[in-house]
Amino acid sequence: MFLKSLHLRHFRNYSEQSVTFAAPKTILVGDNAQGKSNLLEAVEWLATLQSHRTHRDRDLIQQGHESAQIEATLERQGVPLDLAVSLRPSSGRVLRVNGCTVKRTADFLGQLNAVEFSCLDLELVRGTPAIRRNWLDRILLQLEPLYSQLLQTYQKALRQRNALLKQAGSQGWDEALWQAWNQQLVINGTRIIRRRQRLIERLAPLAQDWHRVLSGDRETLTLSYESHVPLGDGTSEAIVAAFSEALATRRAIEFLQKTSLVGPHRDDVGFCLNAQSARQFASQGQQRTLVLALKLAELALVESVVGDTPLLLLDDVLAELDLQRQGILLEVMGDRYQTLMTTTHLAPFAAPWRQQAQILKVTAGTIASVSDTAAQTSD
């Protein structure tokens, strides 16, 4: 898979910008807040129809404008592919593949695959459960595009159920409607739980292997999916039964708090180093190592499932890693993955490495191609 060009219109701080990618490695260099991360975010959005930085399309649109466009040309296993997205909060998204509008997000997802790694990913260890759930969901959206419909169906059931909970105690309570939404929550929630659990089972050995390399085999990493619903033997039948029982048990407290307390929207992912919680006990260096292992595992898994090399998006990551881990990451990248990376300076990159890369200077939403010598002068 190779991203050949990208065109942004009124996306974040880009008024109108086209970029042609001419090498397997592209370095976006520039001061902070110039738009380097925004370009990577646009590529990530094409891969997942989500951003790890915001949940609102409105935030992606340049101030003073009503819509934004992202267009990309790529080559996948020798076949050219054109992708286009229009974002307009007033009327929704318009998705196009090879010039044809697609109605279902599942028909757009999976056309471009990318793994994003930024300094914000340290929150995977120390942040809230929602960050870890969203990480799993973004991976699943690429591996199984129909997962997007499953998430939407579950979220609709959750919204409707919460709306009913806010009416609890008032006249006109509809028990039949309540049970109907409970059933939808259980059926679709079970499917989400099983897919997330399977994803963890596939990621775990890959992450463990990478973590052994990165830590010098001094620590053992374990991953676990921590569900509010007892998983039992992991079958759909067992989870449905446990989910239904949990809803019945928590009914009184849910009526009191007027929100849904059971389901995959409350679940978490556990990371342990030598059987101790990484969130509670890992040092900052250990957290960086853990996250790098997770991202390398994600990269390997996406490649193995989709049968093609995903794009690698590195947002100011090298500054967060020591020299040993920088070296491992750069070695893994090699020429195998098309890589877009951002940096404020070129010092971490050896001269031969820079000579093989396309170097782009980003200044206030404008991108210019520069030679290695010019880039060093501006550094």
Curated annotation (Swiss-Prot):
<dbReference type="InterPro" id="IPR027417">
    <property type="entry name" value="P-loop_NTPase"/>
</dbReference>
<dbReference type="GO" id="GO:0005737">
    <property type="term" value="C:cytoplasm"/>
</dbReference>
<keyword id="KW-0547">Nucleotide-binding</keyword>
<dbReference type="GO" id="GO:0000731">
    <property type="term" value="P:DNA synthesis involved in DNA repair"/>
</dbReference>
<dbReference type="Pfam" id="PF02463">
    <property type="entry name" value="SMC_N"/>
</dbReference>
<dbReference type="GO" id="GO:0006260">
    <property type="term" value="P:DNA replication"/>
</dbReference>
<dbReference type="InterPro" id="IPR001238">
    <property type="entry name" value="DNA-binding_RecF"/>
</dbReference>
<keyword id="KW-0234">DNA repair</keyword>
<dbReference type="InterPro" id="IPR003395">
    <property type="entry name" value="RecF/RecN/SMC_N"/>
</dbReference>
<keyword id="KW-0238">DNA-binding</keyword>
<dbReference type="InterPro" id="IPR018078">
    <property type="entry name" value="DNA-binding_RecF_CS"/>
</dbReference>
<protein>
    <recommendedName>
        <fullName>DNA replication and repair protein RecF</fullName>
    </recommendedName>
</protein>
<dbReference type="GO" id="GO:0005524">
    <property type="term" value="F:ATP binding"/>
</dbReference>
<dbReference type="GO" id="GO:0003697">
    <property type="term" value="F:single-stranded DNA binding"/>
</dbReference>
<comment type="similarity">
    <text>Belongs to the RecF family.</text>
</comment>
<keyword id="KW-0742">SOS response</keyword>
<keyword id="KW-0963">Cytoplasm</keyword>
<keyword id="KW-0235">DNA replication</keyword>
<dbReference type="InterPro" id="IPR042174">
    <property type="entry name" value="RecF_2"/>
</dbReference>
<keyword id="KW-0067">ATP-binding</keyword>
<dbReference type="GO" id="GO:0009432">
    <property type="term" value="P:SOS response"/>
</dbReference>
<keyword id="KW-0227">DNA damage</keyword>
<comment type="function">
    <text>The RecF protein is involved in DNA metabolism; it is required for DNA replication and normal SOS inducibility. RecF binds preferentially to single-stranded, linear DNA. It also seems to bind ATP.</text>
</comment>
<dbReference type="GO" id="GO:0006302">
    <property type="term" value="P:double-strand break repair"/>
</dbReference>
<feature type="binding site">
    <location>
        <begin position="30"/>
        <end position="37"/>
    </location>
    <ligand>
        <name>ATP</name>
    </ligand>
</feature>
